[in-house]
UniProtKB/Swiss-Prot annotation:
Organism: Vanderwaltozyma polyspora (strain ATCC 22028 / DSM 70294 / BCRC 21397 / CBS 2163 / NBRC 10782 / NRRL Y-8283 / UCD 57-17) (Kluyveromyces polysporus)
UniProt-listed CDD domains: eIF3G (cd12933), RRM_eIF3G_like (cd12408)
Function: RNA-binding component of the eukaryotic translation initiation factor 3 (eIF-3) complex, which is involved in protein synthesis of a specialized repertoire of mRNAs and, together with other initiation factors, stimulates binding of mRNA and methionyl-tRNAi to the 40S ribosome. The eIF-3 complex specifically targets and initiates translation of a subset of mRNAs involved in cell proliferation. This subunit can bind 18S rRNA.
First-listed, main subcellular location of the protein, grouped into a coarse class: cytoplasm
Gene assigned in the entry: TIF35
HAMAP family in the record: eIF3g (MF_03006)
Keyword Ribonucleoprotein on entry: no
GO MF entries: RNA binding; translation initiation factor activity
Official protein name in the record: Eukaryotic translation initiation factor 3 subunit G
């Protein structure tokens, strides 16, 4: 059996308190001495938080003391915000990494997509658009397309000597002036539509998933972008699997509303009237 006795409190010169308590347990008397220092901590909070703490409680909590009551209040999980000391350095490192990554991406000078300018599938179409926008500007689109590759032996000799050989002049490269290459380009143009008045927020994925999904497999979708800003110019070229599917898409999509704009859909190259 434990019996507690009266306690003694002694104020010390250093500001602490000595609390002496006595306890009798199983016929033995124990003396317990505790030295306590009282520390007053003041917390600075935002004035809006301080004003909310002064709100009067209502309902079942009327006249209740300050603080949450676990019988009527459910507390969420506490989340501690841990700020790093070198957060500024980490932010600069992430910015530098993003810049290096963006500098390494290949960008076409014509349509702004991730491929070389010489391999742009809409080279001839974009040259016509550039000529309409600025008739006095030199067109450099055809400079790579009209050059015929040199002989395989000369390109191999250049490689052996360590000289740079453009891809169009390397062994096995397609001859842009050949009939087969020209026929394949013409077949692509026959099944390619030009979509204008396109919303600037529409990208290739949006067009495939929300606009072109009824027309089966779409080999190529290119949204023309501004070379400086990277924003869409409201123009896109879509190559379909066949000319018949392209004609069906042209009839169904021309004049249709998409993302708050009325689309204008036509052939990328005008068809000859029969």
């Amino acid at each position: 059996m434990t019996e507690a006795m009266n306690s003694e409190v002694i104020n010390n010169p250093d500001g602490t308190k000595t609390i002496i308590t006595y306890r009798v347990e199983n016929g033995q008397k124990f003396k317990i001495t505790q030295k306590v220092r009282e520390v007053h901590v003041s917390e600075k909070v935002h004035k809006a938080v301080a004003s909310r703490k002064q709100w009067a409680k209502y309902g079942e909590e009327r006249n209740a003391p300050p603080g949450p009551n676990h019988s009527t209040t459910q507390l969420g999980e506490e989340v501690y915000l841990r700020l790093s000391r070198n957060w500024k350095q980490k932010e600069e490192e992430e910015t530098e990494k993003a810049k290096i990554k963006s500098d390494g991406i290949i960008s076409c000078r014509l349509c702004g997509n991730a491929h070389y300018t010489m391999n742009c599938p809409f080279k001839s179409i974009m040259s016509d658009i550039a000529a309409l926008e600025d008739p006095n500007a030199p067109i450099e689109v055809g400079s790579n397309a009209v050059e015929a590759p040199v002989e395989t032996a000369s390109s191999a000799a250049a490689v052996a000597s360590g000289k740079y050989v453009p891809p169009s002049r390397r062994a096995g490269a397609k001859d842009p002036s050949s009939d087969a290459y020209r026929d394949s380009r013409e077949r692509d143009d026959m099944a390619t539509l030009k979509i204008t008045q396109l919303n600037e927020n529409a990208d290739e994925t949006t067009l495939r998933e929300e606009l072109l999904f009824p027309f089966g497999n779409i080999p190529r979708v290119v949204v023309v972008r501004n070379r400086e800003t990277g924003r869409s110019r409201g123009l896109a070229f879509v190559t379909f699997s066949s000319e018949e599917v392209a004609e069906k898409a042209r009839r169904l999509l021309n004049g249709r509303g998409f993302m708050n704009l009325i689309l204008q859909v036509d052939w990328s190259k005008p068809k000859e009237k029969e």
